[in-house]
Amino acid sequence: MEQLNELELLMEKSFWEEAELPAELFQKKVVASFPRTVLSTGMDNRYLVLAVNTVQNKEGNCEKRLVITASQSLENKELCILRNDWCSVPVEPGDIIHLEGDCTSDTWIIDKDFGYLILYPDMLISGTSIASSIRCMRRAVLSETFRSSDPATRQMLIGTVLHEVFQKAINNSFAPEKLQELAFQTIQEIRHLKEMYRLNLSQDEIKQEVEDYLPSFCKWAGDFMHKNTSTDFPQMQLSLPSDNSKDNSTCNIEVVKPMDIEESIWSPRFGLKGKIDVTVGVKIHRGYKTKYKIMPLELKTGKESNSIEHRSQVVLYTLLSQERRADPEAGLLLYLKTGQMYPVPANHLDKRELLKLRNQMAFSLFHRISKSATRQKTQLASLPQIIEEEKTCKYCSQIGNCALYSRAVEQQMDCSSVPIVMLPKIEEETQHLKQTHLEYFSLWCLMLTLESQSKDNKKNHQNIWLMPASEMEKSGSCIGNLIRMEHVKIVCDGQYLHNFQCKHGAIPVTNLMAGDRVIVSGEERSLFALSRGYVKEINMTTVTCLLDRNLSVLPESTLFRLDQEEKNCDIDTPLGNLSKLMENTFVSKKLRDLIIDFREPQFISYLSSVLPHDAKDTVACILKGLNKPQRQAMKKVLLSKDYTLIVGMPGTGKTTTICTLVRILYACGFSVLLTSYTHSAVDNILLKLAKFKIGFLRLGQIQKVHPAIQQFTEQEICRSKSIKSLALLEELYNSQLIVATTCMGINHPIFSRKIFDFCIVDEASQISQPICLGPLFFSRRFVLVGDHQQLPPLVLNREARALGMSESLFKRLEQNKSAVVQLTVQYRMNSKIMSLSNKLTYEGKLECGSDKVANAVINLRHFKDVKLELEFYADYSDNPWLMGVFEPNNPVCFLNTDKVPAPEQVEKGGVSNVTEAKLIVFLTSIFVKAGCSPSDIGIIAPYRQQLKIINDLLARSIGMVEVNTVDKYQGRDKSIVLVSFVRSNKDGTVGELLKDWRRLNVAITRAKHKLILLGCVPSLNCYPPLEKLLNHLNSEKLIIDLPSREHESLCHILGDFQRE
């Protein structure tokens, strides 16, 4: 009872006072903040912190007391008392925690001797990161934030190769000749050859250095494996926590067998993740007693230091091991240079201190955004304090980012504090930067961080352990209850082909498709993230995946789940590009001048000074096929010294223009880096380019590449030519003038030693500035192709959008008019459809490429027959609008549903309008009956719920009609396009999507021959872009008011049609 009274007292003190809200209101606020938070008790408990209060206990010592609950309704409350150093854990109301220890009378006590608290357990941090935080927490946090800033080194490559040789040997043999063979094979693998290329190393030198280690491998195997008696093994000192304190710590350790290699373990229990180099079965011989343990074996290739960082990694791996098996109580640390192995006991003190470090790091990573004390505006938070160790900082890989963040972010704060001894170093690292550069860095860091923390943009890894597969299947991002079938096929080292099928029945309806990245887990608790890879093929009965681990080592009865791995929230690449932009290099300075300081781009005066004499005839021949604006674009690019912007208005042949530009640059002998944000955009250009027999190298995962382009991928060329030497790989990289990849693929080794004459970025107006930056570092000049009047970069976070994150680099640089060329001649829309966009957006600049294009109408082979049937089934006098809609010579109309009526429905799944959906399906059905191919019809709606309803209705009668959002239709076209605007209400409620005039512009420029718009005019007039469009349509008498309950009469007509 005493504990419960204490709980009530704490509720009075902190829950009310600390929150500064009445308890009920504060609880509601917490619940609203975590509507989908999963809470639970038991071994995998997850508690929500309701209140925090720091008090002095009866002994006068400080305690931190937490009111916690594992109940979603917040009814059942418990108390957690933190004592000793646990008081320093920066836990706050609203935090999620996991507790290890015992709970008595609804009270947990965590102190120096017993129990652990894990802060934000869903944030999985690697053991390597935590170990590195021992000397400098700031460096560890920066390394997690600016991942791509840690450079590859010779030592890292040697270490990776040696790890692999050892791991292969422990499953084969440590005989000298076998080790030589394994080393030779490993050094020939493409991924290692690529790193040698990146670092400009000699393959023979690497081979020799690796071979120098091999005698130590033999020594270790001789010492710790395959002995006759237990006393033959070296003596060691190891006391396990479970040992009797009187036991002698001297023992002999025997490595019996390897259990796993690179075992991947995710632990939401301890908030950790990692890959254990080798998991081994070990016998500990102590006198006449023998204990058997399964332990982590950590391999180190550097100096034999037995350092605290190395030992800490091993201790953390023992915690990870507990997710899969009994507590190993210790691990092993092996230095490959000498063959010396150390046992590392994992006692409570070490685990406690490391988990406290993990909590500090998690807090810094979780709280990357703060509110300024004075102005209450959102800002980046301070990082852990800069240490006062000049020697340590001198060799730190994050020193540049550390100094940059300090000067650009922290020193702008009211409470900034920097050690005086470090000020000269910070100045030295950042003195080349202007205030405008620092502000650009700070702003984009803030916007990227806001976007990454957006509720809709967070990685959903935690759903793997929080949500059952059956629940996740409803969203289409998961397939559960899978069993492995047939043998696993080894495609190459590190890639394994697996076939899965559902244990009961067919594969459920899913959004997963070939090329998607997936995480494979076991349905059983603790088998999270067993492997990662790609979906290779999916059909009604099987899913084929290419994975990075061989799962056949698991029992045949193991049930698996596949979860789609979302990548849209990955800010590693853009933050890395931002950091690179601030470096003190020639390329970075030039880009800062152009992009941040808006230096005017420069141009060459005469084309003759650019064009090689022997290329002039070829270029002239290519130019003949272009219209005037396209020829102007070619000339502008050739004359540029810095950059060119090509505005590709709808239907103006943007892809053809880029393909032609590449052909001209190729003919002139220029090297070209061709990029875009999506794989499909890159491949669309390459498909056209391939027809002209121009060679190129396509970088990127082959699973993401169009089948017709896969023969040009690095992976396929290396396989077909059996490239196993650095010389052959260099020859491949140097043989192609044209290299193509996505903007996210710029970490490829080829870019470490290659600078291109030109970089062309397609879809540039849709790409976020820091992502678009990436490829520009590797070219002398760049060409951005896009149209800022169409879709901008996708930004989910409203605050980031308000700060300017949706401004693309294309839009930013467009103010320099001298660099801009507009493509205005379009070949898609007939003149009536084109006039809408001209009026709404382009101020009359768009023109049809020919009379044929201007006058083109839909060809409905059976239109006369359908017209007769409509007149028979529908009273023409009651439906005069019906014939007008289907008349080929009426390309544009807006159907006003105000009188029908067609009210919207707002539900949990989103906004929809069933009446509009029925009308859209009716119209589609008549067009198909009149002779239009379903594949020539496109249906656009702004809301996903509306798409689902239309798809469901169409599935009953018509297939192959593409139903999608505006975003998915960018760059596409159809003969007939029907647009459902959905919103229709009496209270003036408006949504965000229809306020975007750029989306509207895309929607009305997808149709070639007929555009039918459907919506409620009074409701849509609340949206300024639509109001402007509706006024124009009204002036042209293109708005048709549908009669009352028209959808019902049309459904009867459709029923009669279908019965026929």
Curated annotation (Swiss-Prot):
Nuclease activity: region residues: 81-519
Keyword vocabulary terms for this entry: 4Fe-4S, Acetylation, ATP-binding, Disease variant, DNA damage, DNA repair, DNA replication, DNA-binding, Dwarfism, Ectodermal dysplasia, Endonuclease, Helicase, Hydrolase, Hypotrichosis, Intellectual disability, Iron, Iron-sulfur, Metal-binding, Mitochondrion, Multifunctional enzyme, Nuclease, Nucleotide-binding, Nucleus, Primary mitochondrial disease, Progressive external ophthalmoplegia
Phenotype for T655A: In SCKL8; likely pathogenic
EC number: 3.1.-.-, 3.6.4.12
Region (Helicase activity): 520-1060
Catalysed conversion reaction: ATP + H2O = ADP + phosphate + H(+)
Record's GO cellular component terms: chromosome, telomeric region; cytoplasm; mitochondrial nucleoid; mitochondrion; nucleoplasm; nucleus
Stated consequence of mutating K654E: Abolishes ability to unwind DNA, while it does not affect ability to resect DNA
Positions that bind [4Fe-4S] cluster: C136, C393, C396, C402
Cofactors (names): [4Fe-4S] cluster
Domain of life the protein comes from: Eukaryota
Result, substituting K227E: In PEOA6; uncertain significance; the mutant protein has significantly reduced nuclease and helicase activity; consistent with a loss of function mutation
GO biological process: base-excision repair; DNA double-strand break processing; DNA geometric change; DNA replication; DNA replication checkpoint signaling; DNA replication, Okazaki fragment processing; DNA replication, removal of RNA primer; mitochondrial DNA repair
GO molecular function: 4 iron, 4 sulfur cluster binding; 5'-3' DNA helicase activity; 5'-flap endonuclease activity; ATP binding; ATP hydrolysis activity; DNA binding; DNA helicase activity; helicase activity
Post-translational modification: Acetylated by EP300, leading to stimulate the 5'-3' endonuclease, the 5'-3' helicase and DNA-dependent ATPase activities, possibly by increasing DNA substrate affinity.
Binding site for ATP: G648, M649, P650, G651, T652, G653, K654, T655
Pfam families found in the cross-reference section: AAA_11, AAA_12, Dna2, Dna2_Rift
Disease connection: Progressive external ophthalmoplegia with mitochondrial DNA deletions, autosomal dominant, 6: A disorder characterized by muscle weakness, mainly affecting the lower limbs, external ophthalmoplegia, exercise intolerance, and mitochondrial DNA deletions on muscle biopsy. Symptoms may appear in childhood or adulthood and show slow progression. Seckel syndrome 8: A rare autosomal recessive disorder characterized by proportionate dwarfism of prenatal onset associated with low birth weight, growth retardation, severe microcephaly with a bird-headed like appearance, and intellectual disability.
Family the UniProt entry places it in: Belongs to the DNA2/NAM7 helicase family.
Record's function text: Key enzyme involved in DNA replication and DNA repair in nucleus and mitochondrion. Involved in Okazaki fragments processing by cleaving long flaps that escape FEN1: flaps that are longer than 27 nucleotides are coated by replication protein A complex (RPA), leading to recruit DNA2 which cleaves the flap until it is too short to bind RPA and becomes a substrate for FEN1. Also involved in 5'-end resection of DNA during double-strand break (DSB) repair: recruited by BLM and mediates the cleavage of 5'-ssDNA, while the 3'-ssDNA cleavage is prevented by the presence of RPA.
Assembly and binders: Interacts with BLM and WDHD1.
Protein name: DNA replication ATP-dependent helicase/nuclease DNA2
Lineage: Eukaryota, Metazoa, Chordata, Craniata, Vertebrata
